[in-house]
């Protein structure tokens, strides 16, 4: 942007020292890191680790760390807020089990203490989620001869426990949904 180049103006044909060159390239890399942060965060929220990994593909470590600190200071990057939003999205929209959500949060680089705090403060009832899933997504599959077995297997692969699945089927059979 124009402010950056106005700040770092050099006359045509002017020779610069190695130190000036290094300082200029450092400023350019920092600006590149900041611009990349804004670009990535404008698309979706990221954890600090996710953003750091993406920045390190194109920017050096020093400027990556500086840019991340700036995003944290501005409030654009907050792992706790990101974790709460992720839990809400994965549990409500994607209908995932608590254990699968925990695994996904680890994968995205959220600190273990933030994961446990977020999952404690958020009430996720796997049985309610399962009842909803079974009645919407799996209802037709239950009509098949081995439907119960296939649905149970599918739900277990999604991270739900056999106990929770059985409880959900019992609630459906008893009309408690």
List where the protein language model places each region.
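An alpha-helical, amphipathic repeat domain used for nucleic-acid recognition
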Residues: 1-177
């Amino acid at each position: 942007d124009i402010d950056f180049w106005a700040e770092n103006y050099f006359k045509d044909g002017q020779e610069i020292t190695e130190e000036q060159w290094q300082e200029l390239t450092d400023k350019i890399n920092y600006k590149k890191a900041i611009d990349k942060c804004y670009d990535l965060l404008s698309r979706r929220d990221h954890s600090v680790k996710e953003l750091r990994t993406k920045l390190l593909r194109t920017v050096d470590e020093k400027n990556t760390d500086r840019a991340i600190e700036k995003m944290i200071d501005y409030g654009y990057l907050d792992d706790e807020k990101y974790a709460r939003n992720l839990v809400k999205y994965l549990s409500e929209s994607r209908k995932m089990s608590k254990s699968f959500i925990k695994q996904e949060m680890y994968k995205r680089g959220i600190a273990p203490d933030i994961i446990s705090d977020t999952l404690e403060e958020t009430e996720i009832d796997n049985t309610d989620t399962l009842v909803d899933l079974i009645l919407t997504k799996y209802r037709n599959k239950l009509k098949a001869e081995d439907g119960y077995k296939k649905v149970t297997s599918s739900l277990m692969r999604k991270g739900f426990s056999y106990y929770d699945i059985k409880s959900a089927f019992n609630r459906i059979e008893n009309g408690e949904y």
